Amino acid sequence: WAYFFGPGCEPGLRELSRVIRRGGAAFVIDNDASRSTFGGWFRRAFPAYDPSEIEAFWSRRGWQRDRLDMGWRFERREDFEAVVRIEFAAELAEQIIAEHDGLEVDYAVNLWWRAK
């Protein structure tokens, strides 16, 4: 497991290319900050994050993308709140908790992949 956040992760991508055998594939799951409720929260947490720039970064390097829709579903509100507090800084987490009713959150991700 590794984190690749677009520009700046080139050394990690080189290492990934090195260890993937011929005929293999590499996969990266990335938040799709251009859509979904979670994507909006992500943009609030990281205002300098430009989804278009990140998509161009991966595409220029030959990665293919599948856009996936997933979600969070909780049985208890306390569990939702605990996860939000893990994912976001305290002030934003409290804003999200106050603004979002319910036990479900739509969450979009990009599945980036490249065959070797």
Language model features with spans:
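A short SAM/SAH-binding and catalytic strip from SAM-dependent methyltransferases
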Residues: 1-10
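A short glycine-rich, Lys/Arg-flanked "PGG" loop and its adjoining helix->strand segment in the class I
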Residues: 10-22
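Short loop segments at secondary-structure junctions
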Residues: 22-23, 116
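Conserved class I S-adenosyl-L-methionine
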Residues: 25-56
